Regions:
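Sec-dependent N-terminal signal peptides
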Residues: 1-26, 30
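A domain-start/cap signature at the N-terminus of enzymes
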Residues: 29-141, 173, 294
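Active-site nucleophile loop of the alpha/beta-hydrolase fold
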Residues: 180, 237-245, 268-272
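Conserved acidic catalytic loop of the alpha/beta-hydrolase fold
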Residues: 195-209
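Hydrolases whose catalytic domains are alpha/beta-hydrolase-1, hotdog thioesterase
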Residues: 222-227
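C-terminal catalytic histidine-bearing segment of alpha/beta-hydrolase fold enzymes
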Residues: 270-338
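Alpha/beta-hydrolase fold nucleophile elbow
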Residues: 206-218
Length: 338
């Protein structure tokens, strides 16, 4: 499959100017008191050189999203790559967990930042679950964070300080971090969201009935695009992840049977060209050229947008490691604040 190379952020500046068919935060109607976005302010370059970013061919179900590429024998230095794997490939040997699909799953419990933390061992890899200290199940929702390439659930949980970021969001939710593909050769671990939810309940952890928000970084799009038709998913947040699968996300936000009830936030650095192009399709899209320092800096139109596109000033990995993006965006969801 032919390699798709993401264009660096500096070249993509022109891609941030949305065409007339896409609403921007400063477009009429007249701005409300929170509207302070100035389109005359140039978008700053990403923090340092672009981190590696996934390339992707089209999805298995939507091959037209990308022309069929041929993968390189090794990653190009300084670039992330994510593409769709259409054929089975050999994998490194990994320890196997015996699992009949029904019995109780083993978990380890500890306390992290004052909240209960569980690491569940499944046949599809580790699943981390964290409850904030003041969690109230009666009004709680669920946040599922899917990591990108070159890490796993354990690595992302530890190195990206996810518990710290989840706590900083002040949202009343159970936070779930499952294993996901760590490279092009890995299969999607949880192609069906219902199986992931079942694994959590098999560890004797009760899921709340509130809103479900899915966050995916980079190559996580391969997993998230397979969950768009799940009846419980209310909102998806793509963090520099729109490399492919546009048809799936179109179904989620526009053409699917439950699209009227959904919201999508797209944050882009390495994927700015693809993400801006996707947003231009929709008259209801609202664009913003920087991540705000807090949710309060978002205008009412931005907060209420069915599709919010943000051109990030943070580069690919800083989007998920800086602590400036995930907590802020979780406050622009249907979750209840603590």
């Amino acid at each position: 499959m032919k390699l798709f190379v993401a264009v660096v952020a500096g070249v993509l500046g022109a891609g941030l100017v949305m065409e007339p068919g896409v609403a921007r935060a400063e477009d009429p109607p007249a701005p409300v008191p929170w509207d302070d976005f100035d389109d005359a302010i140039p978008v700053p370059p990403a923090d340092g050189p672009a981190d590696p970013a996934p390339d992707a061919a089209g999805s298995p179900t939507e091959p037209g999203d990308r022309p069929p590429p041929a993968p390189p024998s090794a990653p190009v230095p300084g670039r992330h790559k994510a593409r769709m794997s259409l054929t089975n490939r050999p994998h490194m040997a990994r320890s196997v967990v015996e699992d009949d699909g029904e019995g109780r799953l083993e978990k380890r419990e500890d306390t992290v930042l004052g909240g209960k933390h569980f690491r569940i061992k499944t046949a599809r890899g580790a699943v981390h679950v964290w409850f904030p200290p003041d969690y109230a199940r009666e009004t709680a929702g669920t946040v599922i964070y899917v990591h990108g390439y070159y890490t796993d659930a354990d690595g992302a949980w530890r190195e990206h300080e996810l518990a710290k970021q989840f706590k900083a969001s002040h949202q009343n939710a159970i936070f779930i971090v499952p294993d996901a593909p760590s490279g092009n050769e890995d299969d999607v671990k949880w192609p069906a969201l219902k199986d992931l939810r079942k694994a959590v309940t098999r560890a004797n952890i009760h899921l709340p009935d509130g809103p479900v928000v899915v966050i995916g970084h980079s190559g996580a799009f391969r997993t998230v695009m397979q969950w768009v038709d799940h009846r419980l998913v209310d909102q998806i947040i793509l963090l520099d992840a729109l490399y492919a699968g546009e048809s799936a996300f179109d179904a989620f936000i526009a053409s699917g049977k439950r699209a009227d009830d959904h919201k999508l936030i797209v944050v882009a650095a390495s994927t700015a060209e693809e993400s801006a192009s996707f947003a231009r399709r929709y008259k209801f899209a609202v664009a913003r050229e920087r991540m705000p320092s807090s949710a309060g800096e978002l205008s009412r139109r931005e907060r209420g947008a069915k599709l919010l596109y943000i051109r990030s000033q943070f580069e690919h990995m800083a989007i998920v490691t800086s602590g400036r993006v995930i907590p802020t965006l979780l406050r622009v969801t249907p979750l209840k604040a603590l």
